[in-house]
């Protein structure tokens, strides 16, 4: 997301999409990382057309697509006005994106809840996010209470976003159990990073 040479052009996206479908093992496919469609712009491409071209094969195959967004900051690194965020979800939905993973690095629900409502208004699925870290403060109870507020605000899904891969497997497993006991119908998705070496154990714990 920070280096253009690692980002695909629209012609590459269109070529790879059918292969992802043929693999037969994905229910969801990411349409963007933590970046806006700057890469398309750098290539002189229209990002609106690029996203539509990439999502089309997945929609035909019944595979959902999802995006990442920073709540109050939308797809930027600084606050974005509410009317612009509201329009963003309508545009992304029209482009063929089904789910938006809404997060705030500080787990501040005031930065997330308005976006949940805007996404629902636009017909998207808002996946509210818990940014996972490891400290004496970041306990199962801490995260579960945030999940309660996000679900009460209308989020049908929760993402455990272990951005640095340092979430402890045992804690993550207990967190999933705690949320599921109270909200059995809420879908929980785990997002991990493999650098510190804990991610496979975390995957096993959250699945269990």
Please state what every model-predicted region is.
Residues 1-2, 128-136, 156-168, 188, ...:
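Active-site-proximal beta-alpha loop/turn segments in soluble metabolic enzymes
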Residues 1-31, 38-39:
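Conserved N-terminal beta1-alpha1 strand-loop-helix module at the mouth
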Residues 3, 169-184, 188:
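Active-site/ligand-binding-proximal alpha/beta "capping" segment
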Residues 18, 27-148, 165-168:
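Active-site beta->alpha loop and helix N-cap motifs at the rims of alpha/beta catalytic domains
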Residues 21-22, 93, 151, 207:
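Non-catalytic positions within long, well-ordered alpha-helices that form the structural scaffold/packing
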Residues 24-26, 97-99, 155, 185:
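A structural motif
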Residues 141-146, 150, 196-207:
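Catalytic cores of alpha/beta
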